[in-house]
Amino acid sequence: MLSPTNSTSKTAPVPPRDSSKPVLISEEPRNQLLQKVARTALAVLLVVVTLGLILLFYSFSDLQSFPWCCQTHPSTKEQPTISIPVPLPSPPLAVPRPSTPPPPVISRPSTPSAPKPSTPPPLLPKAPKPVKTQEDLLPLVPEQVFVEMYEDMARRQTIEALVPAWDSDIIFKCLCYFHTLYPGLIPLETFPPATIFNFKQKIISILEDKKAVLRGEPIKGPLPICCSKENYRRHLQRTTLLPVFMWYHPTPKTLSDTMQTMKQLAIKGSVGASHWLLVIVDIQARRLVYFDSLYNYVMPPENMKKELQSFAQQLDQVYPAYDSKKFSVKIAAKEVIQRGSGSSCGAWCCQFLHWYLKDPLTDALNDLPVDSVERHENLASFVQACEAAVQDLPELSWPEA
């Protein structure tokens, strides 16, 4: 049975596509083509960027200097020149002429030519300025100064060999020896010695003990280390002169610091900047005598005299005289005694004390030799005599009064 639809209107079925048939342009060549195009475009882009960078970093005048740059040509073209050959003229015919004598040569006086400007001589290079060293800046020292320095050094060595430094032990033995010659002197111990900070208290304490002994009262001050109590009382009763040796150093400013410095120098076995001073308290003559072989090592003599005068007024109240006589003050040294020596101060103090014991109104310091070596030679004789005399004395013991 036939269908009601027309057969001609029917569409023919599409046959299935065969995948095995080749395609005109495959996918792989197409990708390769795209890669080549991309590479070419990238290369062109890089060239453009490079040229742009060159234009940025170089001006136009710099670009013209490159060999590959075209040179500019003038706008007007040169007109070509047409050369027309011109025939050379023939030489003229030679016509003989009568010979004429040459004109006479008239010599004219030569005018002096203007002098050429002289060229200045070439300037010579300036010599470099000499560089002054530190030695050139120092003033020249005359030869005589070196001679005097050498003589001074030799003089000092000679003096140091003549008079050695005296310590507290030798000074105490010397005081014991003086007591045998002058019983009115009390050999005060020098260990520890008095200082600039406590010598006044020490003198007042001894005078207070002397008054107590004269009244028959017990003494209140400290007893000496190397003397018995009874022997010390007998010394106080008979004494009329107190030799107070002071140890001084310029560095410490208090008593405790002075004692510490003294201890340190004793351990080192060095005198350093230490110095011996002497204060004589003459009870019978009511006199304070101050001796400094360096004259003003502690303080100016005027200041020391004022200080001792104030102390003398204090002694008038502590130990008054029966006739109301006041203590006077005397500064013995008028100049530097130990010139050329730094360690003979102890020996000079003992020498002055010996002169004072022989004559309280002595002017022996005014009769000293001017030459420092001769002066210390005389002192060396005194030192040798004292050292020989103290050899028979007991070690660190007070003589019996």
From Swiss-Prot:
Residues 86-128 have a biased composition (Pro residues). GO terms for molecular function: cysteine-type deubiquitinase activity; deNEDDylase activity. It is a single-pass membrane protein. The active site is at H275, D292, C345. It is an enzyme of class 3 (hydrolase). GO terms for cellular component: extracellular region; host cell; membrane. Its EC number is 3.4.22.-. Pfam families: Peptidase_C48. Belongs to the peptidase C48 family. Binds to host NFKBIA. Effector proteins function to alter host cell physiology and promote bacterial survival in host tissues. This protease possesses deubiquitinating and deneddylating activities. Impairs ubiquitination and degradation of NF-kappa-B inhibitor alpha (NFKBIA), thereby preventing NF-kappa-B activation. This is Deubiquitinase and deneddylase Dub1.
